[in-house]
Amino acid sequence: KMIELGYKKVYCPFAPVYHSHNFKLSTYFARYYDEYKGLYEIHQYMMAQHFRQLPRLWVRQVRGDCAYIRQQPIGKKTKIKWAIYSAFRNFDRFVGGTLGGKYHTYSEAKQKFLDKHISQQYRQRKA
């Protein structure tokens, strides 16, 4: 939105940055909701047209992650930890992302409800 309004992006090497790999697992649902809401607004991209597609997409992604994890030179407990993390993170990605991607199809009342209860951007604007 800011770029569309004519603002410019600049790089500042001294600016504090909070990278996504530093987020808590509990914040990803809201992050993906906001991200895919924006991806639809800009590119009309939706990861899934219907929620019934999500189990297949989720299983495929978690399987791929687990195949990668199995190849890593780490202990069995650590592999299990990362496999569980993958399951939860990908659940957040697919459900939060699909909710956000379908945002344009919801009534105004539902949009407000979802923004109020999920969106990180909504909370940041209200702060």
Descriptions of predicted regions:
Residues 18-40, 113, 117:
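Nucleotide-sugar-dependent glycosyltransferase catalytic core
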Residues 41-48:
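Cytosolic juxtamembrane regions of integral membrane proteins
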